[in-house]
Amino acid sequence: TGVQTCALPIYPSRVTRQTVSEFVGSLTRDKLSPASTARCLSAVRGFFRFLSQERLIRTSPVTDVTVPRRWLRLPKTLTADEVDRLLRVAAGKMPEDLRDAAMLELLYATGLRVSELVGLEQAQVNLAVGYVLVRGKGDKQRVVPMGEPARRKLDAYLEEARPVLLKKRTAPKMFVTRRGGGLTRQGFWKLLRVRARQASIAKSISPHMLRHSFATHLLDHGADLRSVQAMLGHADIATTQIYTHVERARLKQLHRERFPRKARRLRRRNP
């Protein structure tokens, strides 16, 4: 795969807000995807934040520049009911059932990336206090609470399923197969699709959809944006702000479907 280059054509000290806006516009004209455009803007914003912190420039010209709303691709999420159905399907007592139940519950409870989930090691999980130490992008670490339901599912998996899957072998990875190795990203994608079908979820589901659902449902229930940013491991809060657009879009759709005056016309009274 190629490396995407995000570069402004002049010296940083001469960059203005208009320069950055024109740069973002050029990315669109070059037919860069909305996600790639947002990533480029995030990289530029981080660079100028660094220059500002080092006092090499007075103010960042990127602070108020955003990707136009029409470019944003809203993340797809599951409803609360769909999540409940998905988390209930792996209710069996087979080792794989207990493992799948623990993985699904933990993924939704923490908003981990799939790579972070399958790469999780036992030493990173503290069941006593209910926290996970996550190694994210760029080897950055963050601590994320898991909640009681996920803690119980993990405890059951560790006590009843993991020893059976490993037999007498040892493995550093938390989630393992009967061969003794760690479950791969592809393996988790496969089991997620199987469990989604069992839960009668018609959507094309992906692990990242559970991460999106985690963030969206937290914000729906009053969580503040900075806390969600910290739990997701986003370097730039602009990345987290996309979830506020999801809530606005949902409310707009709800209003369109449920507002009682949607199909009525106001009648003018005769003077």
Where are each of the predicted segments found?
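Conserved catalytic core of the tyrosine transesterase superfamily
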Residues: 7-271
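Positively charged, low-complexity/disordered segments
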Residues: 1-5
